[in-house]
């Protein structure tokens, strides 16, 4: 064997060694970034120039392929941190930061939230969903609880509690809708007798004010969809998380609670389930790191 051949093989072997070392280092760095949400915070705090949606999704996708459980738990921790610790819904909006993460300038795009969009009212009350939102008269909302457990993509649960302060019938349009509800009993006969004795006077003045509890529960999809590598899309900068959603509502207002029990239309909002949904988790993770 001549010297040229020996050198050639030696160089080739060195190249493969270096390439393998580089891949290993890259993989280790990626694992370090997503091993936990706190490690992601630490990494991007020291490497601000690397923090952009495309790069972040690429890193998370790479690590999901090698360690799905750690990656998903890191994503869920970021979701929790932005809502519960950074008080994304309660605090005044930082327009620049918010639009950078969510691509919009409205908190209606935060999931979950108590709004026409966040409550999927159009699916329950087609044609009058905006009026229903006005009936609730949301004055403020605050995330007070966030728990999650992820065993696998076929077994998980995320539960988020939002407390809100509202004012029933906060404008003329919603007052008209309340009259409509009170004019129809649970059988649709046009009598108030089935409304538990509730009348418009029960929502006048300070009696219109109430506290509400909204529980949002996300579980594995019942339609067979599962979180997979292709849900991480660097091009669009999204991480679409498939899940079924249940929204449960209770309030401090005795008469409103009565209506949710006795009136068919009002009662529809009390406990609703939605299948076939997907939720983009990237904005929360990104927002928390900005």
Curated annotation (Swiss-Prot):
Q: Decide whether keyword Iron is in the record.
A: no
UniProt lists compositionally biased (Low complexity) regions at 186-197
Signal sequence extent: 1-25
Q: Which Pfam families does the record associate with it?
A: Lipoprotein_3
Q: Which UniProt keywords apply?
A: Cell membrane, Lipoprotein, Membrane, Palmitate, Signal
N-palmitoyl cysteine: lipidated positions:
26
Cellular compartment(s): Cell membrane
Q: Which GO terms describe its cellular component?
A: plasma membrane
- The annotated region (Disordered) lies at 183-203
Name the residues where the record annotates lipidation as S-diacylglycerol cysteine.
26
**Annotated membrane topology:** Lipid-anchor
Coiled coil ranges (UniProt) are none
Can you tell me which family this protein belongs to?
Answer: Belongs to the MG439/MG440 family.
Protein name from the UniProt record: Uncharacterized lipoprotein MG439 homolog 1
The source organism is Mycoplasma pneumoniae (strain ATCC 29342 / M129 / Subtype 1)
């Amino acid at each position: 064997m001549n010297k040229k051949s020996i050198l050639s093989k030696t160089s080739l072997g060195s190249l493969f060694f270096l390439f393998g070392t580089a891949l290993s280092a890259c993989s280790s760095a990626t694992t370090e970034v997503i091993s936990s949400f706190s490690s992601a915070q630490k990494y991007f705090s020291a490497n601000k120039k690397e923090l952009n949606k495309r790069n972040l999704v690429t890193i998370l996708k790479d690590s999901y392929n090698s360690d799905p459980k750690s990656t998903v738990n890191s994503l869920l921790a970021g979701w929790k941190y932005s809502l519960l610790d950074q008080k994304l819904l309660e605090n005044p909006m930082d327009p620049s930061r918010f639009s950078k993460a969510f691509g919009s300038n409205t908190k209606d795009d935060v999931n979950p939230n108590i709004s026409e969009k966040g409550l999927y009212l159009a699916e329950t009350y087609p044609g009058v969903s905006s009026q229903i939102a006005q009936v609730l008269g949301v004055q403020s909302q605050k995330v007070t609880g966030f728990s999650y457990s992820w065993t696998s993509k076929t077994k998980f649960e995320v539960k988020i509690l939002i407390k809100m302060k509202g004012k029933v019938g906060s404008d003329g349009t919603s007052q008209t809708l309340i009259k409509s509800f009170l004019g129809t009993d649970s059988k649709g006969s046009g009598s108030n007798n089935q409304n538990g004795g509730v009348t418009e006077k029960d929502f006048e003045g300070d009696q219109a004010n109430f506290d509400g509890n909204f529980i949002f529960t996300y579980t594995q999809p019942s339609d067979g969809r599962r979180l997979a590598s292709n849900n991480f899309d660097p091009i669009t900068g999204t991480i679409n998380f498939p899940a079924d959603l249940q929204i449960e509502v209770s309030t401090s207002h005795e008469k409103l609670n009565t209506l949710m029990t006795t009136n068919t239309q009002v009662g529809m909002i009390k406990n609703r389930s939605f299948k076939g949904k997907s939720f983009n988790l990237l904005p929360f993770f990104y927002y928390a790191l900005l």
